From Swiss-Prot:
<dbReference type="GO" id="GO:0050821">
    <property type="term" value="P:protein stabilization"/>
</dbReference>
<dbReference type="GO" id="GO:0009535">
    <property type="term" value="C:chloroplast thylakoid membrane"/>
</dbReference>
<feature type="transmembrane region" description="Helical">
    <location>
        <begin position="29"/>
        <end position="49"/>
    </location>
</feature>
<keyword id="KW-1133">Transmembrane helix</keyword>
<keyword id="KW-0812">Transmembrane</keyword>
<protein>
    <recommendedName>
        <fullName>Photosystem II reaction center protein H</fullName>
    </recommendedName>
</protein>
<dbReference type="Pfam" id="PF00737">
    <property type="entry name" value="PsbH"/>
</dbReference>
<dbReference type="InterPro" id="IPR001056">
    <property type="entry name" value="PSII_PsbH"/>
</dbReference>
<keyword id="KW-0793">Thylakoid</keyword>
<dbReference type="GO" id="GO:0015979">
    <property type="term" value="P:photosynthesis"/>
</dbReference>
<dbReference type="GO" id="GO:0042301">
    <property type="term" value="F:phosphate ion binding"/>
</dbReference>
<keyword id="KW-0472">Membrane</keyword>
<comment type="similarity">
    <text>Belongs to the PsbH family.</text>
</comment>
<keyword id="KW-0150">Chloroplast</keyword>
<dbReference type="GO" id="GO:0009523">
    <property type="term" value="C:photosystem II"/>
</dbReference>
<comment type="subunit">
    <text>PSII is composed of 1 copy each of membrane proteins PsbA, PsbB, PsbC, PsbD, PsbE, PsbF, PsbH, PsbI, PsbJ, PsbK, PsbL, PsbM, PsbT, PsbX, PsbY, PsbZ, Psb30/Ycf12, at least 3 peripheral proteins of the oxygen-evolving complex and a large number of cofactors. It forms dimeric complexes.</text>
</comment>
<keyword id="KW-0604">Photosystem II</keyword>
Length: 67
């Protein structure tokens, strides 16, 4: 038997959609688009860090960050 707590009763409405699945693909394509955009963001950050993406007049040096 599960212990019933006040917090559990407050949070119960948040779990009302448990077990319900949208038919078909649902929002999977949207998730794929956001994953691709996040990957591109990480790739750009990595290229800036490695200085393989050169930006004009932007100094990527740890010493200049303190100024």
């Amino acid at each position: 038997m599960a212990l019933r707590t006040r917090l559990g009763e407050i949070l119960r409405p948040l779990n009302s959609e448990y077990g319900k699945v949208a038919p078909g693909w649902g929002t999977t394509p949207i998730m794929g688009v956001f994953m691709l955009l996040f990957f591109l963001f990480l790739l750009i950050i990595l290229q800036i860090y490695n200085s393989s993406l050169i930006l004009e007049n932007v100094d990527v040096d740890w010493a200049t960050l303190g100024n």
